[in-house]
């Protein structure tokens, strides 16, 4: 079975200066990418304008890292309509840091994903287990509960706008990385669930990204796994090695 188009997504989180990010964007713009891949850059809200203006590579799109569904009296927030009006068409939702630090439950994440899809966004929806959950043998229960909450809010046709990012929380920013076998096992579990609950056609087209201490050295071996369709990259996406990660999806 051939793989769907891969995705290499940079999650800059709350990092970067105008100078450092401008230099990185210039590097991206000058990079020759000779295969079919969708590259995504999720910057802070403050850096979105600069990124949008400066990033000219045809294989790259910009993304937001979070949003609320509606505009209104929500001081300090940014809404989906505001992002859409600004020309943002991709968004990362449900990242483990949003879940851990800002109290985003499975239900909140699912509501955000559904609202973003309904607003026409391509959504990278994040799921994954903690180290404690993995060591207690609960990886499958946790991950499938998270994706089931999202699926409950979506129609079958909506899945064309959804990308799943599996991010084992214990591997994010820790230097630990899931082995290729661990990544494949989790991705296969997710795809199998989608196949049985949503449809084999949806499962076959669904892009499932791996996120968790991905770097230029381990990306190729991870991507060779049957059900790994690309990456959601944190720390390494702020470095030139993100180009190596993109090229690992060939």
From Swiss-Prot:
One of its GO terms (molecular function) is triose-phosphate isomerase activity. It is found in: Glycosome. Its EC number is 5.3.1.1. The active site is at 95 (electrophile), 167 (proton acceptor). Its main location: other. One of its GO terms (cellular component) is glycosome. Keywords: Gluconeogenesis, Glycolysis, Glycosome, Isomerase, Peroxisome. Transmembrane segments: none annotated. It catalyses: D-glyceraldehyde 3-phosphate = dihydroxyacetone phosphate. Pathway: Carbohydrate biosynthesis; gluconeogenesis; Carbohydrate degradation; glycolysis; D-glyceraldehyde 3-phosphate from glycerone phosphate: step 1/1. InterPro entries: Aldolase_TIM (IPR013785), TIM_sf (IPR035990), TrioseP_Isoase_bac/euk (IPR022896), Triosephosphate_isomerase (IPR000652), Triosephosphate_isomerase_AS (IPR020861). CDD domains: TIM (cd00311). GO terms for biological process: gluconeogenesis; glyceraldehyde-3-phosphate biosynthetic process; glycerol catabolic process; glycolytic process. Substrate binds at residues 11, 13. Homodimer. PANTHER family: TRIOSEPHOSPHATE ISOMERASE. The enzyme contains a high proportion of positively-charged residues in beta-barrels V and VII (compared to the homologous regions in other triose isomerase sequences). Since 2 clusters of positive charges located at precise distances on the molecular surface are common to 4 glycosomal enzymes, it has been speculated that this might represent a signal for entry into glycosomes. Belongs to the triosephosphate isomerase family. This is Triosephosphate isomerase, glycosomal.
